[in-house]
Amino acid sequence: MAATFSLIGTIEPFLHCNLKKGDSIYCEANAMVMMESNLELKGKLQGGLMQSLMRRFANDESLFQQQIEAVNGEGDCLLAPTLDGDMQIIDVGAQQYTLSDGAFVAAQTGVDIRANIQRNLGGAVFGDTGGFMVMQTQGQGQVVVSGFGSLFEIDVTPDKDVIIDNGHVVCWDSNLDYKLSVSTSKKKGIMSNIINSVTSGEGMVLNFSGTGKVIICSRNRDSYQGWLQSILGTSSGGRGGNSGFLNNIL
């Protein structure tokens, strides 16, 4: 029997994991908040060295992920993502998902998070979707994702394409097609689209089509970082400069 996941709390919840003896889960580095003494935590190159390096390149994740195993008997642990925000437990198997940068929190051992070559060149060059690599789920079980702020699930249907600001996308159904552009305008000229993007205040957007769902978050991490920099300043001169501080927390 696989370990079970549940969320505790309504605002910035904990991820509660219950493991029977012999069960294990894996999670992003530093996600563990608390665990009972029957559990054992160790760093592991999940999927081997090559996949670990590819995940590092794709999503700037830690090379070693945490593996928590119930070695001495049943036990519970609490996990939390790095940034403020909500989490969602997703069932994978019949449906697989593509994850944006920093979205992965934890997964059952039946699920593999693999770095694959991105099929969308525009997203590879300009998007927050992992550069030329994207993180995709494989296998069967549950994976937990997080986003900055509250999460909301959007259904995409063949008769209803959806345009989403790139910085608000957490994950999406891998069956969906997506295109990245610099504007929500339907004009075809690249300069007019760039001008519209600048004047409207919108940056990159993703246009999803097909059938599937997209999970979005209410806050944009990059915009928030820019706002903090405007308040605190970006000077990096001297020890403890604000730029270094911001880089450490974001």
Task: Describe each region flagged by the PLM.
Residues M1-L250:
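Composition-driven recognition of glycine/serine/threonine/acidic- and proline-rich low-complexity segments
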